[in-house]
Amino acid sequence: MLTRTVYDVSALTVLTYAPFTYLLTTFYEISSLTAAANICIEVLSFAIPTFLLRPRNAAHKANAPLRNRFLLNSTQVQISSSLLATGVYVVILWGGLKSGFLNLFLVQFFDIPTLEDAHLETPVSIVIKVFVAGVAAKAFLLNPSFAAQPLSGQQTPAVDFDPATATLPQTVEHNFYNFDKRTRTLIQQTTILNAFLFVGTVQRCMTLNGTEFLGAAGYAGLWVLANSIIALWYGWVGDTSADYQLD
């Protein structure tokens, strides 16, 4: 079980507030400075108690032995992975805006005061709004999965699967969840993120006048889709990184 630290909690807080913040700045004429201040307050309200009460996990301890420490310390890997996540958010949001799907969806189920800023959106303006979310996605999804990979010689010996004696849960796990620890961690982190993001975004959207549940759920689902795509990319990144792991 992963130990949640101030880094994980801060990244999760940023990601769960990102959809609502983007909605406010793009469709409700809330300034980016005001939205950024709100996120900072939320991050600090969770991060400070976590920092005081919980120790750092191995991924954030420079002297802790990790098989993939070189990937966590690689500036190139960290920057490119952040840009990858940012790019996914930009493509999803830009595609939704330019196809008319996102605007039509929000207009139908939200009481949107103006679409002017939405029509003025460009990929660059979206990058500015979601770049921090891209960095947070890398920190919450990719880095813990890198850190979860056990050192050589420390893996728990796998028990051979015997269909004749296996229980139903063991059979289901073998057929549908037979992944290494890195992939399991990535799936776990993605599930946690999407659950918190979906529930939190729906709840916050419902505080806006004129919002219907279907609209709030649909908008949150768009971000869940983006996070799932990012996780799939990071799964591939982790697989390709296996060729360069240090033993």
Regions found by a protein language model. Give the residues of each.
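Long, mid-chain structured domain cores
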Residues: 24, 29-34
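Long, hydrophobic/aromatic-enriched structural stretches that serve as scaffold segments
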Residues: 1-26
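Alpha-helical transmembrane segments of secretory-pathway, organelle, and plasma-membrane proteins
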Residues: 1, 18-21, 34-247
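Hydrophobic alpha-helical membrane segments of integral membrane proteins
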Residues: 8, 12, 32-37
